[in-house]
Amino acid sequence: MKKTVLRKYAQLIAQTGVNVQPGQEVFIAADLDQPEFVKMLVEECYKRKAKKVVVDWSYQPLQKLHYRYRTMTTLSKLDNYEEARWQHYVDTIPCRIYLLSEDPDGLNGINQEKMAKSQQRLYPTIRKYRDQIENKYQWCIAAVPGAAWAKKLFPGQRTSQAMEKLWEAILSTSRVDEDPVAAWDAHNKDLHDRCQYLNSLHLRQLKYKSANGTDLTVGLIPEGQFCGGGETSLQGIFFNPNIPTEECFTSPMKGQAEGIVYSTKPLSYQGQLIDEFWIRFHEGKAVEWNAKVNNDLLTKLITMDQGSCYLGECALVPFDSPINQSGLLFYNTLFDENACCHLALGMGFADTIRDFQSKTLEECRAMGVNDSMVHEDFMIGSADLSIDGVCQDGKTVPLFRNGTWAF
């Protein structure tokens, strides 16, 4: 891939993604797959006058070894230096960049019970820090190719060819063209206009139906709103949390979901794939489910904590999105969630409450935003999906027909 194109991508992440501010610290989480691109990204952050850029390197095979050999006690606690780093996040509010490149099958064979229990025990410690920085900092999730991930998508290609093809797919769907910043400005306007229309309807329910058996009604929060594209932090800084993104999303009312929904794409979760599954909801709670592939892992996800069996997000994405038109199944939620409509199990978003800036997290949760240690998107969009919105006055408005926008 040409360095000039990769440089545009690095500039897009630093400028349009996290919007690095002069004097701000930047934390980058990345795997070992793309050191040259990470170097380029670090330089772009410094060009925007970042105070300090720290790269937190990871390597998926080591994660697998940690879960194999470490005790539950050491997996379930933060050491003093780790807590100090979280406190540093609270004190300095750095922007954070996450570069995804992991092998979708990289954690196959791991002890799922050990992983789930250690995460459950660790969560209360992390949450006390996470809640203090919620909506205060800029963050951006983007992707770079990893060798195993590329071979998963293009198994018939040599590794170098597969990596090049994955780069092309990432850059194309991320709108890295002649002028990526201008392309994202136009894209953000389109998403914001659609959200504005959805919010003008004052919806109280979404009704999903598809020929695959999906028949689900989800209640919405009266004080809620649809969001999409870039957003503004509590510090007043505009940023784009996902590159790419195609969604208009909201957090539903906890306790108000009735019916059944079928997945339409595999879900990559904890380095493994869950596929061909359905979930039945009653009074908002997942009460029955089954997956043909990795049902035990789906069960671990849904039962992770008290909130993981409730919905945290309803996202509207047209089936003819650029990602779906690519014809690729990415085996990566960042991309696959933006291929079609999806729901999320677990944590909801406080910023989907109107005037959330003037409210506490506890107030947002009391209004109906779900709380959980997990937030996992699963795809439900199809070529025949229809979604109707029910307004507060009982009027029904078509939102989606044949898998795409009806307005």
Descriptions of predicted regions:
Residues 109, 152-154, 273, 301, ...:
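Short conserved micro-motifs at the rims of enzyme active sites and ligand-binding pockets
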Residues 205-208, 277, 287, 383-391:
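Short polybasic amphipathic segments
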Residues 256-258, 274-276, 283, 309-313, ...:
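Active-site lining segments that contact anionic ligands and/or coordinate catalytic metals
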Residues 11, 199-201, 270-272, 307, ...:
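Short solvent-exposed loop/turn micro-motifs enriched in small/polar/acidic residues
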